[in-house]
Amino acid sequence: MANALDYVDWRGDLSFDTVPVNEIDKYIFTCIGKPDYTGIIPADGKTVTVNEAVGSYFATREDVGDKLGLISSASTLPMLRKIALSDRFRDIKLSGFINKVVVEKTEQFSALTVFSPDGVKYVSFRGTDDTIVGWKENCELAVKEVVPAQLDAKAYLEWAAETYD
């Protein structure tokens, strides 16, 4: 069965003017937010391109290999390598990266904003990673009304709406 890697091979040479943003593109936008781009994607509202961010990520993390932890899809890093070079995705702007881990509060949160060529801004939340903090936070979702990362997500959306309006 075809997957997002196949899609990038198939449509990676086509601009968004030729083929508008679709559900698979939106899925790829979410995958862009999986790695830790600390020091690569600005947190202050300035932007970098997908090509710049992914290139810097692999250049500064030589030991990353082809897999992004135990629970992330094995296709995430190979897909990022492909989109960084593709005509379709390489010039998309990224901004507002945050990666927050507070062990004492059982808090794990990460997000960035993707500036889609159709003018829509997408927020990519990483979700649970393979740290103990992330898994403990997941368990707390079952017994708490609100966990710290949910408050972080709300604050991030408010910040992004104000910053990128």
Task: List where the protein language model places each region.
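Non-catalytic, mobile gating and regulatory segments of ester bond hydrolases
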Residues: M1-Y164
